[in-house]
């Protein structure tokens, strides 16, 4: 679910700045915006490994509980995506900064998500579980990117007849996808918490 958000911004960010502001991907302004976006992601995502360590070492939490609490905090970062399109009316730098913060939240979330596998599953199964998760993430990424493209094409064709939260046409399509991306992490966290409400190591019988 959440991998698709990351790949959406990887794939569509240049097109977004081109569609909304007319900056071609190879223009100096577009390059500056994309550079800023990923600089924010790179610098801030480093803190993704520190927060759960703080909860475990300083607060004495169980590793799973500390990691889940950290992931809940990281899941709130993407909520900033709700403001990317509205703030973009003032300057293209706002979406670049907001998407960068969202991306940093994703990287921190993703690092801890994969670490929960090591917390719960035996070492002999970690590679398999990680591979299955990566495959599911790839499928989700394909679906959100393909679906977004279809939505943008449809919204652009409808023009002012297609509206959402004060935006018409293709901008309305972007606003819809930004809303989905913003909420995906909290939904993912709730699903994880519902499936695994308490820490319980999973034992696999390899004698069968």
Tell where the protein language model's regions lie, with residue ranges.
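A late C-terminal transmembrane helix in Major Facilitator Superfamily
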Residues: 118-157
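Extracytoplasmic gate region of multi-pass secondary transporters
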Residues: 1-49, 106-110, 114, 141-149
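C-terminal transmembrane helical hairpin of 12-TM major facilitator-type secondary transporters
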Residues: 64-113
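Loop-to-transmembrane helix entry
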Residues: 22-40, 66-67, 93-97, 128, ...
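A membrane-interface helix-boundary motif in multi-pass transporters
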Residues: 63-69, 150-183
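Helix-to-loop junctions at the C-terminal end of transmembrane segments
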Residues: 45-63, 152-153
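Multi-pass alpha-helical transporter architecture, strongest
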Residues: 79-88, 174-208
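Transmembrane alpha-helical cores of Major Facilitator Superfamily
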Residues: 35-39, 100, 131-139
């Amino acid at each position: 679910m959440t991998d698709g958000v990351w790949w959406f911004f990887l794939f569509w960010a240049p097109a977004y700045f081109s569609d909304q502001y007319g900056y071609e991907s190879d223009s100096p302004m577009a390059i500056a915006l994309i550079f800023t976006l990923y600089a924010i992601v790179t610098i801030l995502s480093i803190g993704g490994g520190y927060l759960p360590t703080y909860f475990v070492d300083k607060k004495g939490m169980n590793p799973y509980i500390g990691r889940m609490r950290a992931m809940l905090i990281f899941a709130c970062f993407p909520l900033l995506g709700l403001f990317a399109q509205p703030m973009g009316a003032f300057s293209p730098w706002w979406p670049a900064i907001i998407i960068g913060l969202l991306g940093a939240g994703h990287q921190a979330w993703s690092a801890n998500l994969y670490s929960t596998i090591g917390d719960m599953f035996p070492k002999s199964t970690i590679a398999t579980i990680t591979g299955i998760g990566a495959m599911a993430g790839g499928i989700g990424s394909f679906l959100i990117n393909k679906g977004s493209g279809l939505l943008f094409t449809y919204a652009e064709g409808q023009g002012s007849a297609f509206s959402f939260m004060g935006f018409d046409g293709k901008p309305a399509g972007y606003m819809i996808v930004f809303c989905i991306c913003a909420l995906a992490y909290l939904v993912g966290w709730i699903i994880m918490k519902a499936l695994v409400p308490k820490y319980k190591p999973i034992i696999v019988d390899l004698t069968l």
